[in-house]
Structures are given as structure tokens and as C-alpha cells.
Amino acid sequence: MYTGVYRDNVLVATGLVLIKRLPLSFCMYYLPRGPIMDYKDKELVQYYFDQLKKLAQKDHCIFIKFDPAIHVNDYDSKSYNTNRYKETELYLDTFKSCNAIHLGYTTSISDTVQPRFQSNVYSYENIEKVLPKHTKRLIKDADRRNVQIIHGHLELLDDFSRLVELTESRKGVALRDKSYFKILLENYQDGGVIFLATCNVYKLNEDAKIKKVKLEKEIAQTCENAKKKLHRLEDQLRSVDKDIKEFKEIFSEFGQENKDIAIAGILSIQYGNTCEMLYAGMDERFKKFMPQFEPLITEVTKFLGTDFYRNLSYQAIPAVPAVIFVVS
């Protein structure tokens, strides 16, 4: 159910209401990330909930749950703290005046419909210079395997959906399907984008076979007394043989062709001055290619400075609300 409040023919408040039917003709309402309005406007907040409660009574709704996207704090991932912005208490008091009950700043994901914490990558000039050493190393690992990052729209949907399905199977979770992603991209034609990490396994296999021949030749030419060197070369040969075996398994599915294969992906949506990474998927067989988050997120963040993402302040890596309320 869509709800809204107009003032002088201008929409000043809105909220998506999800309705869950319960036994005995009862139900519950849930407003994800809402309602959306100026929470400092106490009169507007009060009016919205008064009208919503009237609808709820007619619908035999036993309670209303909502988690407005209130920005309560910022801190570095290594410096957790429980500070709150001054406006937070003002918003809490406004909601409480509408008989809402604040359920607290829970840190357990099982207590909420959606998680509370959100990781942000802020837009920087020359972002490569501020990356952690660990991230730079992972990017180098991906570069050594010729992992490339491409971006597009509906033309990349098939590959992205396949990667999400693989993630669902691996994690035992239910995400969204191709039709849902298609709706997102169609509705955000100017703000939706799919990023894919790709690699050419055919070329990697050819390089591995050349390296195998070179190692075998070097082992044959190495003196038996040079045990340390032999051990190192044999370890490298075993690693190359393992890679070739894995490439063969991949060829059985994708065919042994000289082409790029999508191995990880992210679907992002631009809204206002932010960009939300909504969904991600990866082919586990390529995990040592390091295509997943660090290189992809870095490339997406670098992309914030292009014409596609104009004036973005940060990129969110999957989203979260700050507070949970119940109105009874």
C-alpha cells in the first residue's frame, strides 16, 4: 500500500506500507525505510501517523512497525562507538509523541527486519592513494589474472542474474531473480548500472600450459642436489597443474573459447547524491581471482567521478536502517 500526504498540492510525506496477513483476519503493517518526510515537522509527523492508524484500525492491524533511515552516527570500522548526532533524540521524541515505542539500538540482526549498520565508501579524488594495503594487494592479485571490470545496463542482466543464483545456492539464501533486477533497471534507466568482473579463462589456460612446459624444463635441468630449488619448482608445477585442472572444469560449462567470462557482479542504483550497492553475486570457482568486493568496489567508487554518477558523496555497501519503532 502506498501512502502520502499533500500540502498545497505538493507531496510532503510518503511511505510504502507492507501488509502481512495474520490469523483471525488480523494483520501487521511494516514501513521499510519510512515514512519519508521532514521528521523535524512535528505536525506533519503527527498527522501522517494519525491517518495511518485510522487505516490500520479499519484493516484490523494489531501494530505498525517502521524503521526510518535516520543517520545517527559515523565512525571508522576500527573505531566503533555509541555516539549519536544531536538530531537523533529530537527525532526519537517526535516519534514517541505519536505513541511509538523505540525498540533500541539492537546489534543483533535477528531483532530487525533489515540490518542497522551500513558501510560507506566516500568519494575521493585519486582514491587509489587512500586504499588500505590489503585492498591494494587483492587488486594486484586480480590484475595478475587479467580480471577486467565492465559496466552496463540490461545487456549485462543475464550474466549478473546467473552470478546471483550461484551466490544463493552457495549461501543457502533467497535473494531476487532476473525479473526483479529487470524492473529495477527499467525504473532507474539513468541511475541503474551493473558492474561485472570478467576474465578470459582461455588465455589463462594457454599461459598456464606455457608456464608448465617451462617449469618441467627447468626441473629437468636442475641438479638433484639443489633440493630447495627443486622443491620450489615442484610446488609451482603442482599449482599450475591445479589451475589447468580447474580451467578444464570451467571449459566443460562455458566451452573452450577465447572469450571473457563474468565471474562477479554488483547491481548499483544512484539516488540523489548517493549510490547504493543493492545486490552482488560471485562464482565461487573464481574466488582466488579476487574479483569480488575489493577490486569491484574500488572500480565502482572510481566510477563515481564519471558523468554517470554526478556529484555523488558516497557509495553504500548494502544498506541499513538506524532505529526500529513499533506503533500500537
Name these PLM-found stretches.
Residues 26-111, 272-328:
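Acyl-donor binding region in acyl/amide transferases
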